[in-house]
Amino acid sequence: MEDVEVRFAHLLQPIRDLTKNWEVDVAAQLGEYLEELDQICISFDEGKTTMNFIEAALLIQGSACVYSKKVEYLYSLVYQALDFISGKRRAKQLSLVQEDGSKKTVNSETPCETENEFLSLDDFPDSRANVDLKNDQASSELLIIPLLPMALVAPDEVEKNSSPLYSCQGDILASRKDFRMNTCMPNPRGCFMLDPVGMCPVEPVVPVEPYPMSRSQKDPEDAEEQPMEVSRNGSPVPVPDISQEPDGPALSGGEEDAEDGAEPLEVALEPAEPRTSQQSAILPRRYMLRERQGAPEPASRLQETPDPWQSLDPFDSLESKVFQKGKPYSVPPGVEEAPGQKRKRKGATKLQDFHKWYLDAYAEHPDGRRARRKGPTFADMEVLYWKHVKEQLETLQKLRRRKINERWLPGAKQDLWPTEEDRLEESLEDLGVADDFLEPEEYVEEPAGVMPEEAADLDAEAMPESLRYEELVRRNVELFIATSQKFIQETELSQRIRDWEDTIQPLLQEQEQHVPFDIHIYGDQLASRFPQLNEWCPFSELVAGQPAFEVCRSMLASLQLANDYTVEITQQPGLEAAVDTMSLRLLTHQRAHTRFQTYAAPSMAQP
């Protein structure tokens, strides 16, 4: 047992180190497993009958499928039986109810025996606790509800926010307007009614002030707004207000009584007597609709903190911000021409020198030293400024190079470049002030007595650091990349991967050099090696002297020929005795596809 645990330690405990996975020889273990399977044999009748694992697995799978089908069929039968019993009980119950109703019309005193009903799982009776309603009470009035009650109309968001419903912890759960119990009238019998049926649908119009101050307006939290109710005959009726007294309408002086905390009197709901159509036609329809007051806005609202990551609505109107006037900068005329201007401005006849304009404008004031060091502060002038500075530096380098040559060769090249010398002298006069505002670190004076061979080094030193920094960085990066490619630190895992690549690469190249495999060509070659028809020939003799991959290809071709009935395959009986005893017999030289082309069915043959 210990040998097995040591052998399969990598399977029992997962390897966390990735490099140790390369130490597991998967091919050797698979080979040993196949050898063990080859040695295991389950046979019956002294080796004559062997167990076929594939057939056994298919048998188990088929048995499971058949059993599952039978269980499913039994399940459906049970449900059909339950539906049949429930339907039969329901039909019997309906017939009993109809007979019971007919008996009540003839003789209401005869009791009706109730039979135990079949209890269905999905048919639960309605719970009517604390409700005493008579089902046999026939109403003489015609119940018509032409309008939707206001209690069923969904309130607005403003009304919901005006009366929030808080939990014990102080969290806002919902609005008190969401629950119908808060807007319904309790009936003396125990149920909640949406309409005040106990009140008369026609009430005399009471002259009141246009906007009386009632308790509901004083304290909106205690007395919420009651919506307009609709009676059963279709006419709107006023809802009883807690501030009104039963004797008469509320007077204007009732405000003080309401503020003093007088308890409201309960209004007794008396059942209205049924009226005939003639009486209702004679009475004048004097009623008024109660005005629905707007929801009062809360005094203090929580200031919502805006979400900075919330996406903006493209159709929303943004807040108008106050225009802040900035500091404008005007470009001198003639420096830059603005395209697309219809109005032609009269510019300067001659282009003004930028360097002279800059010195006159900024270098002569008292704080000129600071301005000269920092340069211009205009973003539009940056390009022109640095371009001009670059031209000045190039001119200074050429002038220094010329002076060095004249110092070491005084008489050789005096008359060679008069035009360039004159031009350099003129530029030197113009650049006399340029040395003032340039940084002292940008150029270095050459010492006297410098050799001509060192002129290039002096030019490199005289070049400003800002201009050669980019070139220096590029050279350093290229040098670093070139050196880092030579000294790459190889880890243990990369070294093993490289060894594996060195091992597998020759095998892959060898396989790429093989001839492409065509099973029909190999089948023709195998058929041509048979000496004659109907003669058994061992497979080892047919593939003698061929490499391993050619033997495998010939094996596949022989199986294809056996499938086409071109050859016949046989072996010796027994499991161990049948190893390497495969023999083939050629049945026909004609290929399968040619036989199928010339094949004629017996039914199509002419008599």
Swiss-Prot record:
Q: Which GO terms describe its biological process?
A: female meiosis chromosome separation; female meiotic nuclear division; meiotic chromosome condensation; mitotic chromosome condensation; mitotic sister chromatid separation; positive regulation of chromosome condensation; positive regulation of chromosome segregation; positive regulation of chromosome separation
Amino acid composition bias (Acidic residues), ranges on this chain: 254-263
User: Is Phosphoprotein among the key words of this record?
Assistant: yes
A Gene Ontology term for the protein's cellular component = intercellular bridge
Location of Phosphoserine modifications: S95, S231, S235, S252, S494
Key word Transmembrane present in the record?
A: no
Give UniProt keywords alphabetically.
Disease variant, DNA condensation, Nucleus, Phosphoprotein
The entry's linked illness reads:
Defects in Ncaph2 are the cause of the nessy phenotype which is characterized by a specific defect in T-cell development. Nessy thymuses are smaller, with corticomedullary junctions less well defined, and cortical cells sparser than in wild-type. The thymocyte defect is typified by an increased proportion of CD4-CD8- DN T-cell progenitors. Only thymocyte differentiation is affected in Nessy mice and not cell differentiation.
As for what it does, the entry says: Regulatory subunit of the condensin-2 complex, a complex that seems to provide chromosomes with an additional level of organization and rigidity and in establishing mitotic chromosome architecture. May promote the resolution of double-strand DNA catenanes (intertwines) between sister chromatids. Condensin-mediated compaction likely increases tension in catenated sister chromatids, providing directionality for type II topoisomerase-mediated strand exchanges toward chromatid decatenation. Required for decatenation of chromatin bridges at anaphase.
| PANTHER family assigned | CONDENSIN-2 COMPLEX SUBUNIT H2
The Swiss-Prot or TrEMBL record describes its family as follows: Belongs to the CND2 H2 (condensin-2 subunit 2) family.
Question: What is the protein name for this chain?
Answer: Condensin-2 complex subunit H2
Q: Which organism is it from?
A: Mus musculus
Give the gene that encodes this protein.
Answer: Ncaph2
